[in-house]
Amino acid sequence: MSPSLEAARSAVAQQVKFDILTATQEADNEKSRQEIARSFISDTITVPTKEMYTYATLASLGDDVYSEPSTTALEAHVAKITGKEAALFVPSGTMSNQLALRTHLKQPPYSVLCDHRAHIHKYEAGGTAFHSGATSILVTPSNGHHLTLADIQEEIVLDDNIHLVKADLIRGSAPTEVVALENTLNGTIIPQEEIIAISDWVHSKGKKMHLDGARIWHVAIETGTPLKDLCDPFDSVSLCFSKGLGAPIGSCLVGTKEFIKKARGFRKLFGGGMRQTGLLAASAAYALTYNFPKLIDVHALARKLEGGLKEIGIRILSPAETCMIFFDPSTIGVDYVELVERADALPSPIKIGGSRLVLHIQTSPQAVEDLLALIRQLAEEKRAAGFVPTDITGTPSGNIYVRAKKPE
């Protein structure tokens, strides 16, 4: 090799070289963990523990496209506990949901019926329309909590009634092929008997049922219901490892062997075929074993926070059935922006995004106490300034998920 070529290669290697770790990385990571313990923005912010990292490094190192052993084992386990024939590991819950819809839907025109608050409608970048060419039928629960069979029967478009008559108006829509539910949705649990009633009727019409079960783990541990029973009414289910369970990445889609075989092809088409996923699969396995049981403590802490908010006079828009609380501080004269700013200004800041408070397996009980103390202080300040607390009752209507935003 000529000296000039060797020098050129060395120069290229120097250009490519990069060390992502800083001199203070360990301290920075610890600071980040402390901040996460005081954040109520989402349960997606949880981070892997050192124990999870250690466990993950022992996983097999194969290529998932060629049936990597650890990933294959995880898929088999998730299929077993959900009572389905097969499972597919994918990078995200969004991909899992969209793969399910794309696999179920054959020939347009067709529609997907879901709750108007559903993740597949609001937070998946229009994927239902883009990937599957499907329109969405958005339904508002008549009870303000969850979709019922009556809600679905009123809005579903069957093959023989594309000109749906409602409120003396005729509107055309594509026939519904999939009814998609979400459990939990905004932290609330759909009664299983309602799900079964919906499933029986939908299947009697020859349609499919999909469940966005990103947080189905919360339902299982809170109600003591086996995952198999929760998933049985559905043709496909998406389950997430990186939200409440605290794994760094990944979801599983479950269904029949034929369904998953087809979904695997779409996963490749979507760019979701991965290589050495053993580390990720092992992290998910660790989360199932060690983090899943912790969810019941998360729920208890959420109920404690809800109780404290009520005592102060805060209106609860949606109670802590699992890990989320939606609240309205206007009853004590405070708006979301003021609360966010005051929480952020604490010596040990607390992070809030708006009306939604999400607790997770790394939430500090002290953070709950500090948040309640701050809100109690704000209530006292408002009363001292002459504000008369209000008592708003009744079921809230409209969107209860309000993000704090300063007026422009």
Per-region residue spans from a language model:
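Conserved PLP-enzyme active-site core in the AAT-like
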Residues: 2-363, 367, 371-408
